[in-house]
Amino acid sequence: FGQSEEWNFQNSLDWHLLDYAPHKGIQEVIKALNEFYRSEPALYENQFVPDGFEWIDYNDGENSVISFIRKGNEPKDNLIIVCNLTPIPRENYRVGLPKKGILKEVFNSDKKKFYGSGKYINKSIKTTEHKWHSRNYSTIIDIPPLAMVAFKYST
């Protein structure tokens, strides 16, 4: 919940901070991330093997954006994850993708309930046959500032 004081084992946690929206938002995003982790096989099935992770792009230092794929045992469980590590929104950002299809946003840390703006929500997104990041397909997404978005291919 965003404890603002250093932890002290002799005192209780500052639970009263949950009365403030930013602190409540931190609690909600951590709760949602835990639920997301438990519900998405790609996040836990192959977490200790190299085949469970594949970089899409780790070289975009200019925009401070990283993107990667987390892989489950079944290709339908794979997740495309994109992180914007700056306070600047990245609108119309192109991401290389492994295959053709429609992507559905399955997690966005910028939702209003997380004390985010709620402005940069990606609906269903079609891939195009446009080479990017050494891949045959790509799409354009909006990435909120200081946020992580995750996508899955629709079946």
Task: Describe the residue ranges of each PLM region.
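Carbohydrate-interacting/catalytic domains
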Residues: 1-155
